[in-house]
């Protein structure tokens, strides 16, 4: 009886371990608090160097997203052009860097539909 209970507990723990590692691959790189209509870009400083292979953008309110600029630890940068309207809680597709990069700064360019909008930037290893 104890053997069955131990085996069941081991199976549950192994399933939980796999589910946490799958969600640990995606993390929040940063987010903006406001995108105002008169100021068409927002800077998101990344406090620590975060390694990411690809990124995804999520709009917390309606926004027109034009481009996002990522700056890396070695001084280089990468620009992703979007030129599209994102509705509330809509996400872009995953955009890949060439290889895993250390992101230090993010600039989001766009216009808020109602004067303010939140943008969340996700990273994946």
Short names for language-model regions:
Residues 35-65:
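Short, surface-exposed binding/anchoring microloops in extracellular/periplasmic proteins
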Residues 9-17:
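Bacterial N-terminal signal peptides
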Residues 41-47, 91-98:
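Exposed aromatic-hydrophobic patches
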Residues 61-82, 120-124:
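Short, surface-exposed beta-strand/strand-loop-strand elements in extracellular ectodomains
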Residues 1-9:
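Bacterial N-terminal signal peptides that target proteins for export
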Residues 50-57, 98-113:
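Noncatalytic modules at the cell exterior or secretory-pathway interfaces
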Residues 30-35, 79-87:
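Solvent-exposed serine/threonine-rich low-complexity stretches and specific carbohydrate-binding patches
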Residues 18-25:
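Sec/Tat signal peptide C-region and signal peptidase I cleavage site
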């Amino acid at each position: 009886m104890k053997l069955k209970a131990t085996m069941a507990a081991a199976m549950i723990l192994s399933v939980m371990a796999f589910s946490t590692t799958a969600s640990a691959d995606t993390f929040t790189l940063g987010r903006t608090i406001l995108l105002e209509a008169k100021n068409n870009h927002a800077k998101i400083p990344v406090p620590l160097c975060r390694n990411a292979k690809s990124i995804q953008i999520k709009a917390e309110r309606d926004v027109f997203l034009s481009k996002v600029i990522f700056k890396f630890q070695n001084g280089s940068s990468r620009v992703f052009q979007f030129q599209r309207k994102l509705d509330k809680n809509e996400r872009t597709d995953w955009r890949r860097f060439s290889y895993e990069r250390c992101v230090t700064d993010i600039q989001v360019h766009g216009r808020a539909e109602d004067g303010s909008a939140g943008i969340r930037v996700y990273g994946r290893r």
